């Protein structure tokens, strides 16, 4: 697999064409991407005979890292105001439609979308990735707006939106597009769609529980812990959300035990379910619990 420093530099070279792109976006994307790819590498070796896609292919790996970095950057564009609302609207349209951005300063968007379109093992995955990007952008926008609105969401509404704002569907779809994981076919199965919803809910709750102290210190309100405490100050919120997390995890395990999904979906889902311990808690920047910053909404 490509060396970490070299991978970070390649992501940074691409990201320099995006206004507001930071070193942290590249570093965390490579770190998270490495974690995922290492966990599914044996399975990708097994599928390569069918797909012809080498799990060690540097072009595929760097493209995956760049898509993860894009998700981090988009998250911070919403939470930290890295770009103006007009610029963000133009970027969202470009990424969601797969066309060049109408405004200067965001050439990397078109470059990445063109790369993904060219590399797509299954064109259905590229079309789905555009749709997932639109859903992610809309969820980020809605969450940011609700955090400052007079009338706040219920917990159910928050979690429903959070399933899209955690962007796990985007991550999975990008992996499928690059390594031929047949996600477009699997999405037709109700059990697979249920797995997507459950692992995304798990990811949202893990993210919020890990980042709640930092979000509170930074004045962030788009977090399940903070939302529930505002509504119910006497509620044992952390215990409640940990129970919710455990329940979603049990339901996920039941579905995974009942259904047989082709490799590498088992190890991939397991890797994402363990991300709080294996990724968030080992972060030295974005997810450090002692660092005060906004924008802890990003995906793994």
UniProtKB/Swiss-Prot annotation:
Coiled coil residues, start to end: none
SUPFAM superfamilies named among the record's database cross-references: Terpenoid synthases
Protein name, as recorded: Uncharacterized protein blr2150
Organism: Bradyrhizobium diazoefficiens (strain JCM 10833 / BCRC 13528 / IAM 13628 / NBRC 14792 / USDA 110)
Pfam families: Terpene_syn_C_2 (PF19086)
InterPro entries: Isoprenoid_synthase_dom_sf
């Amino acid at each position: 697999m490509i060396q970490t420093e070299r991978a970070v530099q390649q992501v940074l070279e691409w990201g320099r064409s995006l206004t507001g792109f930071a070193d942290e976006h590249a570093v965390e994307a490579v770190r998270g991407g490495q974690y995922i790819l290492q966990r599914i590498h044996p399975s990708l070796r097994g599928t390569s005979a069918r797909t012809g896609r080498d799990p060690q292919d540097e072009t595929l790996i760097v493209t995956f890292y760049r898509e993860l970095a894009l998700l981090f950057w988009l998250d911070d564009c919403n939470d930290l105001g890295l770009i103006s609302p007009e610029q963000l609207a133009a970027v969202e349209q470009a990424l969601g439609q797969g066309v060049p951005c109408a405004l200067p300063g965001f050439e990397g968007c078109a470059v990445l979308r063109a790369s993904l379109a060219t590399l797509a093992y299954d064109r259905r995955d590229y079309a789905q990735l555009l749709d997932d990007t639109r859903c992610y952008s809309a969820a980020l926008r809605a969450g940011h707006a609700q955090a400052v609105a007079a009338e706040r969401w219920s917990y159910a509404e928050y979690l429903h939106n959070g399933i899209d704002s955690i962007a796990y569907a985007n991550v999975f779809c990008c992996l499928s597009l690059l390594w031929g994981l047949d996600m477009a076919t699997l999405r037709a199965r109700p059990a697979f769609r249920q797995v997507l919803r459950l692992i995304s809910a798990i990811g949202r709750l893990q993210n919020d529980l890990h980042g709640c102290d930092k979000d509170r210190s930074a004045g962030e309100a788009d977090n399940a812990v903070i939302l529930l405490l505002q509504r119910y100050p006497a509620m044992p919120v952390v215990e409640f959300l940990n129970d919710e997390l455990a329940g979603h995890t049990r339901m996920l395990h039941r579905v995974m035990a009942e259904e047989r999904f082709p490799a590498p979906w088992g190890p991939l889902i397991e890797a994402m379910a363990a991300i709080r311990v294996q990724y968030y808690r080992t972060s030295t920047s974005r997810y450090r619990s002692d660092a005060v910053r906004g924008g802890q909404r990003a995906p793994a």
